[in-house]
């Protein structure tokens, strides 16, 4: 399924709800902390098991923990220490949407993930260089984040 080019919210939602798992993986991205942004030169990455995150929104705001499970079907992640009690009284992980967390530590065990980070960093550097060239080569015209000031 190709991604919808329509501007109709109905069709965008339908595409989101019916997206295949390999495309949902890309939709599970969360922003990186300012320290990681500076270190890796990228703004966001898809969340993976083993990443350490801080919850930024919701009832569990401020909690910090490792991601123990990523559910692509429900588009939710489960964080260590973020639990609720079900009707039987057993603790259960509380599902959190990845847009509501910030990654503070990356799990870099996977070589392919390191390559993805490097590729995204190079792409960003290239974009910044092109923006500087388009602005007449003046470094003041481009802010630190690559936005025109």
Curated annotation (Swiss-Prot):
GO molecular function: rRNA binding; structural constituent of ribosome
InterPro entries the record matches: KOW, Rib_uL2_dom2, Ribosomal_uL24_CS, Ribosomal_uL24_euk/arc, Ribosomal_uL24_KOW, Translation_prot_SH3-like_sf
Gene3D superfamilies, sorted: 2.30.30.30
Pfam family, one: Ribosomal_L26
GO cellular component, one term: large ribosomal subunit
Keyword annotations: Ribonucleoprotein, Ribosomal protein, RNA-binding, rRNA-binding
Keyword Ribonucleoprotein among UniProt keywords: yes
Gene Ontology BP, a term: translation
Quaternary structure and partners: Part of the 50S ribosomal subunit.
Family recorded in the similarity comment: Belongs to the universal ribosomal protein uL24 family.
Described purpose of this protein according to its UniProt entry: One of two assembly initiator proteins, it binds directly to the 5'-end of the 23S rRNA, where it nucleates assembly of the 50S subunit. Located at the polypeptide exit tunnel on the outside of the subunit.
Protein name: Large ribosomal subunit protein uL24
Organism: Hyperthermus butylicus (strain DSM 5456 / JCM 9403 / PLM1-5)
Name of the coding gene: rpl24
